[in-house]
Each structure stands twice: as C-alpha cells, then as structure tokens.
Amino acid sequence: MTQHPTQSPQFFLTAPSPCPYLDGQFERKVFTHLVGDKASEMNDLLTQGGFRRSQNIAYRPACETCRACVSVRILAQEFTASRNMKRVLQHNSDLVGAMHNAEPSTEQYSLFRSYLDARHRRGGMSDMTVLDYAMMVEDTHVDTKVIEYRRRGPDTFITGKGQGELIAVALTDKMADGLSMVYSYFNPEFEERSLGTFMILDHIARARAMGLPHVYLGYWVNGSRKMNYKMRFMPQEHLGPKGWERYTNEAVSR
C-alpha cells in the first residue's frame, strides 16, 4: 500500500512521568513534529494555542488530573517597567545583545554548562553534552535566533555588538505576533545583575521595536516558586478555556 505524506500534523501523547514543578503530580505531554516548509506557520499557530518548542518538537501539557500549567504572554506594547525593573536596566546598561542565526559555539556551551552546574545541577538538562546543546540550538525549522549579551565596546554604536566575555544568551523564536523565549541562561557569578529579568526586559524592548505585540514566556505554574518571576511582567495574558484573556493580580509585587 502506498503512503502519501500529509500536511496535517500528527500528535502523540507521552507516558506519565513525575512533574518537575509540583510534588506528587505526574505530567503527560501531547507533541508533534515541526518540519517542512510550513514549520514556522505551524509553530506560530501552536504557540498561540499554548504549545512550546524544543528543537523540532512542539508540545503542551496534557495531564489527566491537573491544569496548573498556564501559557503566559506579555503585552509588550503596553508594558511599563517598574522601579525595580528600571534599576535592573540601569545596572545592566553596560551590556548589549547581538542577534545571530541559530548557530552554537563552544563559548556558548561553556557558559551553558556553568549555568546548569550552578543553578540546575539536578535538573533534566544537567547531563547535556556539547552535541546535545548543539542540537538544542540548531535543530530548528523555524525562525530561531541566538541573542548573545556582552559588555559594550567602543564600536558598539556602529556594529551593535559587544566585546569581551559572553555574559548571557537567549534562544528565541521570532513569530508573526511576537517573540517566544525558548531558553535563556547566564553567568551565575553575576547573580546581582538579575540577568534573567534583564533578558526578558530586553525582549520586550525588541518586540516593541519590531512592532510585535507579544513576548511569550512559556508556562506559569501556580504554586511553583520557580515560576513566580513571570507574574512581575504586567500587563499580560493567560490562555484559558475561552482563549487568551488579560490577567490582573493586584497582589503581584512590582
């Protein structure tokens, strides 16, 4: 029997595994492959529907008894930085981010390795090799960019690039309606710089400059302390049963 390729994506369901965010819970994911000349268009649609990308896979939670994972996107054009965020921007005013094609480097992997060893030694990515990292960056069929952050140099105004050591990196998908932050990491020795916050603020500024309405942050998990930082970037929308809806929480500390 002859089989013909189909343009419609095929979806698969993973087996249950321990949830990395909530103790005692088990997670399942539904996923599909992002390949071919329609990969970018499909990634846009799936991201708007609550999926995340990892290499050439788009996935979203499909847990049987839990709905704690909520897709979050910042309304970039309406965003106003808080006083604390303005201090973060000022503290990092000596840094500049240069956007490159999705190409890995040994310098990136060295920084990535230092970040994991300091912050996520027991995480699911802790045993990634240099080849694993290269696949994470370059195994993409969508418009993926790597943003490298370094200190400003005398030629930065002309070149748009920094100089010296690599301080932080963001792996980002450029979509029709926004920027999706796939993964980011930084030099753990510069914890006082709040580089995670800085990179999100930088993505908001980039989205605004590009005329894009959203910055996608992935999932917020109510009850997970490691996810609380996402609630600081207001206004934002959450994806629920009725679609994307504006979220407000007066208790969020700004």
Curated annotation (Swiss-Prot):
Catalysed reactions listed for this entry: N-terminal L-glutamyl-[protein] + L-leucyl-tRNA(Leu) = N-terminal L-leucyl-L-glutamyl-[protein] + tRNA(Leu) + H(+); N-terminal L-aspartyl-[protein] + L-leucyl-tRNA(Leu) = N-terminal L-leucyl-L-aspartyl-[protein] + tRNA(Leu) + H(+)
Task: Please provide, in alphabetical order, the Gene Ontology terms of the cellular component aspect for this entry.
Answer: cytoplasm
EC number(s) from the headed UniProt entry: 2.3.2.29
InterPro entries with a match to the protein in the record: Acyl_CoA_acyltransferase (IPR016181), Asp_Glu_LeuTrfase (IPR017138), N-end_Aminoacyl_Trfase (IPR030700), N-end_Aminoacyl_Trfase_C (IPR007472), N-end_Aminoacyl_Trfase_N (IPR007471)
The lineage's top-level taxon is Bacteria
Please list the GO biological process terms of this entry: ubiquitin-dependent protein catabolic process via the N-end rule pathway
A molecular function (GO) term? arginyl-tRNA--protein transferase activity
Q: What does this protein do?
A: Functions in the N-end rule pathway of protein degradation where it conjugates Leu from its aminoacyl-tRNA to the N-termini of proteins containing an N-terminal aspartate or glutamate.
What does the sequence similarity comment in the record state about its family? Belongs to the R-transferase family. Bpt subfamily.
Cite the PANTHER family for this sequence.
Answer: ARGININE-TRNA-PROTEIN TRANSFERASE 1, ARGINYL-TRNA--PROTEIN TRANSFERASE 1
The molecule here is called: Aspartate/glutamate leucyltransferase
